[in-house]
């Protein structure tokens, strides 16, 4: 009888210890990155900021938003077509845990029907290239087309040097573009 009571007592004590360790573990992880080593905190913050920007509902193929992080300050840059997107990006980043200050240097592209028509022609020329189906089916298009007063800049990432050249060539063959700058990176 005594052995049975001691066995039940040890099992109960083990369960209580396990539950208390689980609660301590859950409490430490609910604080965000406070329990991570300092070398991982900036990468985690960078991932959370990137995710908050990618989740913006009107962030499209004709917009580019870049960011840099200095301590707890995030600086936003780039070009967007919709004025509201500039402020939505700032608001989304401001709500990320670990961000204390946001500097918004995003430029709003000028309204222009000529630029809108050029954007459409650029999109069709680039994403209808043979072999570019893998880029065109993605929800977040990897090749971004920035048109400002007739000047085109391609930004984003492609899979090879050949894809970069093909995208640049397709863009240069679109009429009414004053210039085309190919800033695509290979990844």
Locations of the language-model features?
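N-terminal targeting leaders
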Residues: 2-187
């Amino acid at each position: 009888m005594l052995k049975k009571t001691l066995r039940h007592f040890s099992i109960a004590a083990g369960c209580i210890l396990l539950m208390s360790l689980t609660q301590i573990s859950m409490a430490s992880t609910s604080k965000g990155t406070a329990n991570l080593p300092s070398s991982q905190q900036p990468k985690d913050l960078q991932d959370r900021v990137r995710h908050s920007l990618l989740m913006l509902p009107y962030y499209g193929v004709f917009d580019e938003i870049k960011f840099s992080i200095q301590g707890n300050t995030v600086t936003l840059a780039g070009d967007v077509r919709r004025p509201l997107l500039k402020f939505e990006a700032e608001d989304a980043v401001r709500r990320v845990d670990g961000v204390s200050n946001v500097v918004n240097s995003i430029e709003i592209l000028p309204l222009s029907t000529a630029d809108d028509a050029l954007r459409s022609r650029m999109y069709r020329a680039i994403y209808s290239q043979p072999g570019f189906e893998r880029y065109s089916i993605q929800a977040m298009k990897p090749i971004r087309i920035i048109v400002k007063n007739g000047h085109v800049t391609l930004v984003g990432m492609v899979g090879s040097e050949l894809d970069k050249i093909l995208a640049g060539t397709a863009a240069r063959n679109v009429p009414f573009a004053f210039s085309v700058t190919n800033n695509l990176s290979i990844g």
